[in-house]
Structures are given as structure tokens and as C-alpha cells.
């Protein structure tokens, strides 16, 4: 068995709590509930995609999207929405569902112009204060692989409700050092899987938000 394919969310889940990760992703004896916030986020992403891709008007419910999406729409370049990318274990591009896929990610929006690109990830969180740019980093590095002509990426986490953007610039020549960090993170998951050791990592989320009822740190115990 392989822990691959992995993604940013998979890494974050493991780092948050290996035991919970095991039950959700390996044993699969528990599932996270599909919350109203998740459904809202999915709908917002679809509205954004339809606007950028097809020019479909934004519903009144999502009127706050008009400003940021119009700004993105005005940018010159080839606009690609909800792009599914895969990489094999040699970091060569492959299909999202290919048998040899090692890493997977979906970019909300990529705008390509000559040797530069913008990589955008939409967020519906009400605050950008604790933004994690790891997802941006992985999307940028995968974009370099899938579009080898690109040398520089301006990336951003776009908090559409808060009207804030967390920005970062990535250059192709720096990709190697960035990948090393993610190889290390992935190796920790590999070791846990090989040794079948999935220790709980207690936090303030355990008692009210964890679905793994059998864990001693769960609030039901």
C-alpha cells in the first residue's frame, strides 16, 4: 500500500492529527460531515468559474465577488479555471486520475501570459489572518511542471468575503529547494504508514470537532 497520491489537504490533515488522518484516509471508518460552510464554498467556486470561463452573471447572493473577479477578468492572458493537475514521483506531469499519480492539486484560476502566470486560490474564510500559503506554493510548483515555459508566478490566496489577498511570488529556479520541504513532509506520512503508527495529537479541536469517537481525547469520552 502507498500513502500516495497526496495533496496539501492530506498533508495538513496528517500534521493536525495522525490518528484522525488514519481513520479518515486509511481505515476509512469515519467521515467528516459535509457542512453548510463547505457547501457554500463549493457553490462560490462554481459561480467564480462560470463568471471567468463563460461570462455568466454573478448571482446577487455572491455580489461581493464582482469586484475581485472583475479585476481578475481584466488581466490579459489565457485563463484556465479549476485546473486539475497531477505529478508522478519523478515530478513529471501526469493526469489527475492516472495510475502513477503521486501528487494531486486543483488550481482555481491560472492566467498565463508569455513566461509569467498568476495562480489564484479562492477562500471564503472571513479572515486572512492565519492564512497558510502552503497550498499556493504547491500549486505554483505544479504549474511550473505542467507549463514549463513559465518562469515566474504571482500567486495569491483571495479571501473574497474579507476582500483581502495574501500574495507570494515564485520563481522556477527556486522550485528545487521548495520541493525538498514537501518531500520531508511526505516522508513523515510514509514512515507512519510503513510502521503503522498513528499517534493522536491532542488540540483544542478534539472535544467538539473530531469525528473519531473512539479516541480518548474525543469529547464523547
Where are these regions (language model features)?
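RecB-family 4Fe-4S metal-dependent nuclease core
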Residues: 1-221
Amino acid at each position: 500500500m502507498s500513502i500516495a497520491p497526496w495533496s496539501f489537504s492530506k498533508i495538513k490533515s496528517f500534521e493536525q492529527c495522525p490518528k484522525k488522518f488514519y481513520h479518515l484516509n486509511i481505515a476509512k471508518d469515519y467521515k467528516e460531515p459535509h457542512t453548510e460552510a463547505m457547501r457554500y464554498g463549493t457553490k462560490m467556486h462554481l459561480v467564480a468559474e462560470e463568471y471567468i470561463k463563460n461570462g455568466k452573471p454573478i448571482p446577487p447572493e455572491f455580489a461581493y465577488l464582482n469586484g475581485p473577479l472583475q479585476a481578475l477578468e481584466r488581466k490579459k492572458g489565457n485563463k484556465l479555471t479549476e485546473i486539475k493537475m497531477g505529478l508522478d514521483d519523478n515530478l513529471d506531469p501526469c493526469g489527475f486520475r492516472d495510475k502513477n499519480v503521486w501528487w494531486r492539486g486543483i488550481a482555481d484560476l491560472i492566467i498565463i501570459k508569455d513566461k509569467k502566470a498568476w495562480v489564484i486560490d479562492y477562500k471564503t474564510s472571513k479572515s486572512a489572518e492565519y492564512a497558510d500559503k502552503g497550498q499556493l506554493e504547491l500549486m505554483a510548483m505544479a504549474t511550473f511542471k505542467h507549463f514549463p515555459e513559465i518562469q515566474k508566478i504571482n500567486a495569491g490566496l483571495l479571501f473574497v468575503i474579507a476582500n483581502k489577498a495574501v500574495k507570494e511570488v515564485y520563481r522556477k529556479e527556486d522550485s528545487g529547494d521548495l520541493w525538498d520541504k514537501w518531500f520531508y513532509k511526505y516522508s513523515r506520512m510514509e514512515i507512519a504508514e510503513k510502521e503503522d503508527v498513528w499517534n493522536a495529537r491532542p488540540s483544542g479541536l478534539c472535544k467538539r470537532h473530531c469525528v473519531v469517537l473512539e479516541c480518548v481525547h474525543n469529547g464523547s469520552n
